[in-house]
Curated annotation (Swiss-Prot):
GO CC annotation, single: plasma membrane
Main location: membrane
Pfam name, any one: ZnuA
Record-listed Mn(2+) binding positions: 68, 130, 196, 271
Keyword Membrane found: yes
GN (gene name): mntA
Family, per entry: Belongs to the bacterial solute-binding protein 9 family.
Protein name: Manganese-binding lipoprotein MntA
GO BP, sorted A to Z: cell adhesion; metal ion transport
Alphabetical UniProt keywords: Cell membrane, Lipoprotein, Manganese, Membrane, Metal-binding, Palmitate, Signal, Transport
Amino acid sequence: MKKVCFSFVIMVIALIAAGCGAEDTGTSEDGEGLKIVTSFSILGDVLENIAGERSSVTYIVPIGEEPHEYEPVPSDFQAVSDADVFYVNGLGLEEWLQRLVENTSDVDVVEVSPTIDALPLEESDGLDPHAWLDVKNVMKYVEVIRDDLVERDPDGAEIYVANAEAYLQDLQELEEWIHDQVTTIPEEQRTIVISENAYRYFGEAYGFDTVGIWELNSHEEGTPGQISRVVDIVKELDLPAVFVETTVNKSFMTTVSNDSGVDIAGEVYTDAVGLEGSGAETYIDMMKHNVDTFVSGLSQ
């Protein structure tokens, strides 16, 4: 689908960029701060905590969709072209979107992950992009974003630095809370089984093994052989629970649950925060929800 529509989108976006590329967007609509656009909701929340009321923040990928599968529409590129800066996770998450923006707009594209010790994919070339599932990595994101915002908008430096300091403290408290919570799970039951093996950063940070039906961005997802392998692992480890993601088709993990006789303990958030009313509307609340779900399911 991406290959089919690529040329068409390029032509549309080129027209959009030509219409607005000569105009310097400068600051946000109120004459202060910056117009900030980012790729997905988790980064949007992080940026809002740092930018505060000084700058406006919007994100492209709707909640509930996966950033690496999202098909941008022309209005998305219009928003990016009108922005002062476009922040992306990097590590291959938004690679093709990033290339399109760089080829059709003068807006600066900034990766927030250059200081991350990235994990390589296990079954293919490339890097695992889900670094935000380790809170310490998000703290590194905050430092990169803070420094970049201060450089772009020196008049707002005091606001950005103060907001980042407060948010870093909140993240440190979250990090300590997670470590406290996972100690309640018996060590032999600290294995997270999920559809897409996206929790490797979380596992390395907090002492879990992780198992996915498929690896990230796999062209073969949910094959009988993949499902059978995971069912065997669940039975062999005598795990009390498996889990599903909010942005992934649940039918595959339902099959694993049925074939292994092990219940699905709940949904976790991987590539997006929760919708309003979910209790997981922010990155911090999302992580707390995930940890509570893992602890409840694996402590049985």
